Amino acid sequence: MRKSSRNSKLRTSNWLARRFNLATSSACEGATFEDLTNSTGVLVVAGPKSRELLEKISTDDFSNENFKWLTAQDVNVGYAPVNAMRVNFVGELGWELHHPIEYQNHIFDKIMEAGKDLGIKPFGIRAMNSLRLEKSYKLVGTELSIEYSPYESGLDRFVHPNKGSFIGLEALNKWREKGFDNKLITLEVHNTKDADVLGNNPIYKDNKVVGRATGGEFGFRLDKSIALAMVKPEHSNVGDKLQVDILGEMYEATVIEESPYDSEN
């Protein structure tokens, strides 16, 4: 099963459908293609006490030894079958709980009831956006898009050109040979007032545009205004000083190390 964000539903399903139709009949024998987006849901449980909470509502083992980071398992939560993934977008211990949509209210109620004495609180997409920026986590459609190569987006460790042929390998090799025009960086924006970087803000050096912000928000754990940006490689070194336009006003910004919150995980 291929899982992606709901915002990528059309892009992902169209891409898979095209590849499915282009494949030889023998390669697809016995296979079907179905979009399950509307029949599934996902809830995220994240925070230092997320393991403790899940072990209160499931008979499965969520220990670090049994449930490694970046792995998935089929578990139960109450009466619900759940595909749990030990990954999340907020930079804390946590799991994504993928489930049949008809079980969502049951799972949510179990989580909130079990989490009362742990101080559980619901959070939404704006809070998650702030948290992910403090970890320099990249979002599909902003930092990750067809405009940039995986190398420009900081995905080097996920690219293995020597593993054999794959879709895009030839283009990727040509891109590597000619060099890259952009590099993704993390910025601390100084002395912001009532607004932070939102996205598509121009980035300047000596009054010349050298890139654009892809996203930004105030980071409450860091107590700093944080942004991610694509800039010319010569302006991507840690400590480089740049300027960013926020609602027509210029603010100083400094290139900082990736993942400024809990960089050692």
Residues of each region from the PLM?
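Conserved, structured C-terminal
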Residues: 1-3, 7-265
